[in-house]
């Protein structure tokens, strides 16, 4: 069946990734030793999307763990599901990337990349019909961003026709872990624009907001944030793993979501978000789910969808529900907010429904929006980048690893192009072929 090979790179990627494996192992009834203790045949029907079966009926994740320092790997191995992974699939260096994209992409990471590719090839060979890859990484650090993008471009060469899907943690506007985040992120986005099919932009700040406002957690930990991310990740692939009335896979998703090849940065969301204590006091309706799903408070990227327009949207519903009601509510949402959808893509909402809800909920929905508002993230990073790059601050760390200033300039202009592409489609109407016409039309209106 349609397998997905999961790769997690760097500290952030490994922490989110291991949380994700806890969530889907729970959904499939796989315990920390890899044995199945489920209660339904549905859990096993398509378990081989993410797991391969080893001798003795053990299920082993199709997962490759990569880092340039051993620390995070050790904590994954010592964590609750650490014994689940194939020991050979931990590939790590000793030196660390030190939050330096150039180390991850050109020096330290480049030395390790062949051994990682070997492990990835092994995983792919055990697949029956590989659908694609998903990678978890952050764009602010050194390994996930530098080495992560290096791996993506190498895998693109080797598996050109497979889907490349990334869950990328963007630098946050207020919460910064590293001073050189804007550099690392810009260099990474420069790569992602060219080499991935779908990128889910996740943002720590948006996750913090969800934890504070909606989940009412007074001091959220990274564990809480990662829990939100893994809920989204599990939702995106539900349709592959469980039977449903309307199935979607990564390729269908890409075909429906990406109107222009460069604009494949999605804003994920999840509903219902209820605080852990208050779950049992509510019963959810499809209408409430749909309303919550389009709410800016539920978005996992720190940009406001009301500042842009949706090019396309996909919604993955989970749980037993009436298809008619889902269709009605989705239509209703589009009609009510029609000004937030571009009118030159009719029916730009794709819906999928899967019968199995996540643990602890009767029904839920995972939201993916390809909105022009995502340019806010890129604009923010770009501004920070420009301020530092103008003074050539911190550049010696990168040029010392053999990078050229030209590469920074290219990455910067590529990102600015991306922003203006989003802006252009945000303003485009049905009748305009060119932007000049648009200004002309505006002018006529004023005369009239």
Curated annotation (Swiss-Prot):
InterPro entries: Beta-tubulin_BS (IPR013838), Beta_tubulin (IPR002453), Tub_FtsZ_C (IPR008280), Tubulin (IPR000217), Tubulin/FtsZ-like_C (IPR037103), Tubulin/FtsZ_2-layer-sand-dom (IPR018316), Tubulin/FtsZ_GTPase_sf (IPR036525), Tubulin_C (IPR023123). GO terms for cellular component: cytoplasm; microtubule. Coiled coil: none annotated. GTP binds at residues 11, 69, 138, 142-144, 204, 226. Mg(2+) binds at residue 69. Gene3D superfamilies: Helix hairpin bin, Tubulin/FtsZ, C-terminal domain, Tubulin/FtsZ, GTPase domain. The keyword Chloroplast does not apply. One of its GO terms (molecular function) is GTP binding. Residues 428-448 are annotated as: Disordered. Its cofactor is Mg(2+). Pfam families: Tubulin, Tubulin_C. It is found in: Cytoplasm, Cytoskeleton. Keywords: Cytoplasm, Cytoskeleton, GTP-binding, Magnesium, Metal-binding, Microtubule, Nucleotide-binding. GO terms for biological process: microtubule-based process. Belongs to the tubulin family. Tubulin is the major constituent of microtubules, a cylinder consisting of laterally associated linear protofilaments composed of alpha- and beta-tubulin heterodimers. Microtubules grow by the addition of GTP-tubulin dimers to the microtubule end, where a stabilizing cap forms. Below the cap, tubulin dimers are in GDP-bound state, owing to GTPase activity of alpha-tubulin. This is Tubulin beta-1 chain. The lineage of its organism: Eukaryota, Metazoa, Spiralia, Lophotrochozoa, Platyhelminthes. The gene is TUB-1.
């Amino acid at each position: 069946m349609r397998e997905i090979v999961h790769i997690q790179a760097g500290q952030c990627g490994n922490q989110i990734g291991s949380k994700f494996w806890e969530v889907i192992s729970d959904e499939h009834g796989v315990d920390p030793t890899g044995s199945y203790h489920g209660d339904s045949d549905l859990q096993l029907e398509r378990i081989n999307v993410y797991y391969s079966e080893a001798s003795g009926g053990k299920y082993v994740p199709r997962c490759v763990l990569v880092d340039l320092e051993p620390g995070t790997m050790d904590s994954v191995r010592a964590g609750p599901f650490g014994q689940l992974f194939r020991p050979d699939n931990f590939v790590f260096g000793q030196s660390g990337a030190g939050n330096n994209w150039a180390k991850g992409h050109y020096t330290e990471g480049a030395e390790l990349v062949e051994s990682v590719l070997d492990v990835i090839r092994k995983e792919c060979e055990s697949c029956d019909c590989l659908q694609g890859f998903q990678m978890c990484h952050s764009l602010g650090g050194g390994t996930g961003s530098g080495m992560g993008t290096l791996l993506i471009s190498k895998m693109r060469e080797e598996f050109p026709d497979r889907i490349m899907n990334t869950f990328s943690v963007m630098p946050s506007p207020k919460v910064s872990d590293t001073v050189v985040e804007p550099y690392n992120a810009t260099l990474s986005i420069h790569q992602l624009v060219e080499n991935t099919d779908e990128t889910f932009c996740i943002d720590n700040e948006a996750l913090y907001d969800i934890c504070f406002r909606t989940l009412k957690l007074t001091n959220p930990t990274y564990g809480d944030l990662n829990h939100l991310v893994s809920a989204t990740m599990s939702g995106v692939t539900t349709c592959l793993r469980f039977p449903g009335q309307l199935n979607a896979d990564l390729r269908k998703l890409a075909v429906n979501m990406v109107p222009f090849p460069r604009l494949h940065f999605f804003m994920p969301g999840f509903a219902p978000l209820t605080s852990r204590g208050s779950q049992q006091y509510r019963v959810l309706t499809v209408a409430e789910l749909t309303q919550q799903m389009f709410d800016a408070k539920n978005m996992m990227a720190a940009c406001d969808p009301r500042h842009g327009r949706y090019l396309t949207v996909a919604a993955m519903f989970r749980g037993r529900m009436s298809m008619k009601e889902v269709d009605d509510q989705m239509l209703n949402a589009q009609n009510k907010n029609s000004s937030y959808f571009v009118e030159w893509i009719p029916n730009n909402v794709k819906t999928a429904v899967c019968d199995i809800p996540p643990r602890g909920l009767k029904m839920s929905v995972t939201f993916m929006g390809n909105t022009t508002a995502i340019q806010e993230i890129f604009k923010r990073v770009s501004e920070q980048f420009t301020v530092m790059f103008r003074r050539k601050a911190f550049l010696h760390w990168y040029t010392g690893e053999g990078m050229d200033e030209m590469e920074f300039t290219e990455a910067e202009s590529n990102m600015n192009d991306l922003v203006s592409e989003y802006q252009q489609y945000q303003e485009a109407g049905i009748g305009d072929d060119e932007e000049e016409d648009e200004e002309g039309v505006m002018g006529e209106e004023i005369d009239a």
